Amino acid sequence: MTLTEAKRIGSRQGLISVGLGLLIAQFIMTLMISTDEGFVKGFFWFTDIDYWINILIGAIIMLACGHFYGQIAGKLILIRKWNFVLTGFLIGLAVILTTTFFASWTGFIQEGIDNIGTNDDPFFDYIFKPMYWVTMFGLIPALIIGAWFGGRTKKKGKEKHGTQQGV
């Protein structure tokens, strides 16, 4: 297994895992909103909010993080033989925290900068609070999807390694 192959496998599995995470987030939001508004309105919840650009930027950042951190995970799991469950969990946590941190700056720039010097604390409101809540609600999904991601990365690495040796 070369480093390039390990990174490619990790990147692909990272992007698949991020896609799964985004689908789960969409499903959760649909369920929460559809209880009051109906399924169609719940499914298209993002069309009725003022911060859709923040969601879009967050999704793009999350995909980039999935690619970048996935490469790191591929190297750690397939080359260095780290524990795939722990590595997957830590990488999953890194993806959601990095995404939250950078996506939060969108709201800070849009609204928070105007509140600097007032009684409001824009850094706390736009950076710290999202980090806190994503950590609280994202810990268990990061563990589950991260472990699944680590297992798939390890499995794909074994499949790739086995086909190269003629097994």
Role assignments for model-derived ranges:
Residues 1-167:
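Juxtamembrane/disordered regions of integral membrane proteins
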